[in-house]
């Protein structure tokens, strides 16, 4: 009840601000009184601002994910927890090389997968034997978390940890109180033994453990550990400070509100309330006036765009030629940082324990391109702070003869996010020509258009939530790209089968004779239900079948539907293969088209 009283009192202050010229802002969360009108709710939404931690996080703009662990050495995306710790043995581990490469790319924070779903811990934890302490690396005396944190501190980079609640190795997983205590203990170790941690990242994966049971996570206890040990850290994805953008493709929303009724999972009624509003992390509309009118509460809950520089999240040598091009990375930058989000780009180290040369080179190219593009503001005037209301516009001179193709707009989000619709025009040969238009601005909005040489640009705020505060405007020229994208041959044998014997389960005579088989590939169709769990069998005669791999799932394929490479530990000889889908990404058993499967022969 105290919160409702506070909000009602605050509303009174806001309404009275027109007379007193006082300004009142509220951090992070507002709960609406049942009697509030749509206009009153909107006014409060305009007053909602980030916490200090959220604001400092937003200013980072570029953050890096490091997926490194047992999967690096098994070639999988999701390990099953049965892997031997001895498999983890990087031959030339150098965390400082990671940090230097990231710094050259312009990244301000690095987040390490301290434990992925396989349960293998990259620090010598006291909670399990499944850790670096029982690996061959450094004779069991290594600590990836320590070495990366030391390197980050040395080079002035912020540091975060990813700790997977889903643990496919822990025997106690599924025994909720016991496992929750183990997880709390792991959090304690990570958050109390390595200095300051700036972001703690939880995903929502909750599959079965080694005993076939699922776990009920004690989020409240987990958050309490973070708040008590690292009060300045933001809690991401399953926390209430930073939300997932809703895809792993590097795509932000054209309309991206940091002020949203979307409830984080920290709230007990999150599922019911989000269902009532018809919204989720992947919803297109997360902050419209209509949603706010229907909402019981609103939150400052900004977007983080996570995507990998490669098709997979962990390192796979066959993807060395599939590192995203410079042009693709720049597109992602414009669609994340340039759409009111923070970019979290994954760069997976290889089996040496190094960021591969291809990735490191691409990071350097990316950093140089972004730095050079935004180092030269083509505007003739630099003081651009502007307080505006619906319909207001302002003109800015461009340096004589300068060509531009990019405009930057920023709101002062410490005074709320308020712009709903805007347009950008250029004065060309005496006429105003529309260059770009958009909806939300937020912390930063970047707009691209064809090369022009205007005398002026004009920014018009067509719709705002009361008065908007524009803190920065810039006009820039982004140079064209001169590189082509990389291609990779997906399969060594791809669809050129001697005969398809059966479609469900898919049974194929590969070449009409026995051949060497070293693995297979699956190219998913993300427009239909995809295969998730499967059995892949080989035969020399079509009667007796063997299963060459214990891997029976395409890990993370639902969120990241890229070609899957499954390599066997030992090469096989076979004429026939059979692929049986036991579970699809939506719970069904989809049929696989023969053209989606390829065989790796070398």
Q: Could you say what each language-model-derived stretch is?
A:
Residues 23-451, 460-480, 526, 568, ...:
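Mature catalytic domains of secreted/periplasmic carbohydrate-active enzymes
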Residues 1, 427-433, 539-548:
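Asp-box/BNR beta-propeller loop motif
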Residues 400-406, 454, 512-519, 573-575:
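Extended extracellular/luminal ectodomain segments enriched in beta-structured repeat modules
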Residues 1-26:
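Bacterial Sec-dependent N-terminal signal peptides
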Residues 391-396, 503-509:
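Non-catalytic, beta-strand-enriched accessory regions in extracellular/secretory proteins
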Residues 404, 419-423, 517, 531-535, ...:
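Exposed beta-strand and adjacent loop surfaces of beta-rich binding modules
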Residues 434-442, 547-556:
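Solvent-exposed serine/threonine-rich low-complexity stretches and specific carbohydrate-binding patches
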Residues 296, 480-498:
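Predominantly extracellular/luminal regions of secreted and cell-surface proteins
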């Amino acid at each position: 009840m105290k919160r409702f009283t506070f909000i009602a009192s605050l509303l009174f202050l806001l309404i009275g601000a027109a007379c007193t010229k006082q300004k009142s802002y509220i951090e992070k969360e507002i709960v609406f009184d049942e009697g509030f009108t749509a206009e009153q709710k909107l006014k409060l939404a305009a007053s909602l601002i980030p916490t200090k931690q959220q604001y400092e996080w937003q200013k980072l703009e570029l953050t890096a994910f490091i997926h490194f662990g047992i999967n690096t050495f098994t070639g999988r995306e999701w390990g099953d927890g049965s892997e031997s710790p001895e498999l983890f043995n990087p031959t030339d581990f150098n965390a400082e090389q990671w940090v230097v490469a990231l710094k050259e790319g312009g990244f301000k924070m690095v987040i390490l997968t301290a434990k992925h779903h396989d349960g293998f811990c990259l620090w010598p934890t006291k909670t399990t034997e499944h850790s670096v302490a029982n690996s061959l690396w450094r004779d069991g005396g290594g600590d990836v978390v320590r070495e990366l944190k030391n390197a980050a501190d040395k080079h002035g980079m912020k540091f975060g940890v990813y700790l997977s609640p889903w643990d496919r190795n822990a025997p106690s997983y599924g025994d909720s109180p016991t496992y929750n205590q183990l997880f709390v203990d792991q959090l304690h170790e990570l958050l109390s033994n390595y200095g300051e941690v700036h972001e703690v990242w939880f995903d929502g994966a909750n599959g079965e453990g080694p005993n076939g049971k699922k776990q009920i996570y004690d989020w409240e206890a987990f958050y309490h550990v973070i708040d008590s040990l690292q009060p300045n850290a933001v809690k991401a994805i399953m926390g209430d400070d930073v939300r997932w953008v809703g895809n792993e493709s590097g795509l932000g929303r054209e309309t991206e509100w940091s002020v949203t009724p979307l409830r984080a999972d920290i709230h007990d009624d999150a599922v019911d309330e989000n269902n009532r509003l018809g919204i989720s992390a992947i919803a297109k509309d997360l902050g419209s006036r209509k949603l706010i009118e229907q909402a019981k509460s609103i939150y400052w809950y900004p977007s983080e765009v996570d995507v990998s520089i490669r098709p997979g999240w962990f390192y796979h040598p066959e993807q060395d030629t599939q590192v995203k091009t410079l042009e693709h990375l720049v597109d992602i930058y414009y669609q994340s940082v340039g759409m009111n989000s923070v970019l979290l780009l994954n760069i997976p180290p290889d089996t040496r324990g190094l960021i591969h040369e291809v990735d490191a080179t691409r990071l350097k190219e990316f950093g140089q391109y972004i730095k050079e593009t935004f180092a030269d503001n083509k505007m003739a005037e630099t003081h651009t702070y502007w307080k505006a209301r619906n319909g207001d516009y302002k003109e800015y001179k461009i340096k004589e003869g300068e060509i531009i193709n990019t405009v930057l707009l920023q709101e002062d989000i410490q005074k709320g996010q308020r712009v709903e619709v805007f347009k950008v025009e250029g004065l060309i040969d005496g006429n105003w020509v529309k260059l770009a238009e958009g909806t939300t601005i937020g912390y930063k909005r970047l707009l691209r258009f064809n090369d022009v040489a205007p005398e002026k640009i004009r920014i018009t705020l067509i719709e705002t939530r009361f008065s908007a505060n524009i803190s920065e405007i810039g006009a820039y020229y982004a140079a064209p790209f001169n590189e082509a994208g990389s291609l990779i041959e997906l399969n060594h044998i791809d669809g050129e089968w001697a005969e398809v014997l059966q479609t469900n389960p898919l049974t194929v005579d590969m070449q009409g004779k026995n051949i060497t088989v070293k693995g297979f590939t699956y190219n998913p169709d993300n427009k239909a239900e995809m295969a998730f769990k499967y059995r892949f069998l080989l035969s020399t005669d079509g009667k007796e079948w063997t299963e060459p791999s214990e891997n029976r799932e395409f890990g993370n394929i639902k969120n990241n539907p890229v070609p899957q490479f499954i390599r066997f530990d030992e090469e096989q000889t076979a004429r026939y293969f059979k692929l049986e889908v036991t579970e699809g990404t939506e719970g069904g058993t989809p049929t696989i088209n023969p053209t989606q499967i390829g065989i790796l022969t070398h």
